[in-house]
């Protein structure tokens, strides 16, 4: 069976549901597909189809994630829902599902709970830029003042973690009522909260800048010299575009970036005028010897990324079952940090008052690398020990 072609007619946005266990994330996800399916803009996915999400592996970590897609009049969405709390933590830290915005589901009957807090904090740490709130199960609360109270609590919690709590849109409704309704009319009253939510998502979560429009960056995977022509570096363009004749910087492993000009670009042995995000290319560099550039450095638009050695990061430590360590590690632990295409040794400093880090923990730490790497906030990495992955992290702040 031939695969359907992905028609890129509408802007694309990645979103996901976050929130405490049993507050209705998966029910809401199913309800969204149901209501939009009635409008011909989605395929209905039942609760069970979403709940028994297939396992995926991202950076050596097994994560259960359900991916659903749907459209509104304005945009095309890819929506992620995870069955278990640990799956969310792993998903957000590894960047397996990069979210442009999140729908925070809070039960009006219970109010914010520990995982509500943890998911908001994680969203903040891994740079989920926008959150909208769905206040679920409002049919189970008789007193409107209680609903207002929960709403205030949610806004305060969002503000506490650096989101604009006062302006975050909050939609109230019952995902279960929408999911169980027999009505085939998309404008039935029980579907209104879902339509209102999608309207808010359309308007409040901006369309992200596409990778192509960002400044050029290509992690270097391999280096060769071509007799009579010079040095060629190969890799996959991560973002931006590069034209023949443009100046780039080689960043990493040296305190200062080094400038050079790309005098030729090739893909599949054919000459290109321009490389764009996603292309696997070879770039011919002017005046660079083969021993002056290596795997693990990046080619970048001048001035857009700098080499750093010290940063703060949010890290998930793999459990023994996931192939991670069997024992905790302590302050001063020195594993390898795998950034893009290479490993660099670094030393870990745990937060004050934290003695050790257990397998399965989610922890903030400071890392100091032995050599500088092209790093920016939001960059993902794996922590490895003897070739196996023992953790996954995301850079939250650069120190030096």
Swiss-Prot record:
Protein transport among keywords: no
EC number in record: 3.6.5.3
Region annotation G1: where it falls in the sequence: 19-26
Subcellular locations according to the entry: Cytoplasm
Positions of Mg(2+) binding: 26
Region (G4): 136-139
Molecular function GO labels: GTP binding; GTPase activity; translation elongation factor activity
Binding positions (GTP): 19-26, 81-85, 136-139
Keywords recorded for this protein, A-Z: Cytoplasm, Elongation factor, GTP-binding, Hydrolase, Magnesium, Metal-binding, Nucleotide-binding, Protein biosynthesis
Region G2, residue ranges: 60-64
Keyword Nucleotide-binding tagged: yes
Oligomer and partners: Monomer.
Family of this protein: Belongs to the TRAFAC class translation factor GTPase superfamily. Classic translation factor GTPase family. EF-Tu/EF-1A subfamily.
HAMAP family, A to Z: EF_Tu_B
Function, as annotated: GTP hydrolase that promotes the GTP-dependent binding of aminoacyl-tRNA to the A-site of ribosomes during protein biosynthesis.
Name of the featured protein: Elongation factor Tu
Organism: Caldicellulosiruptor saccharolyticus (strain ATCC 43494 / DSM 8903 / Tp8T 6331)
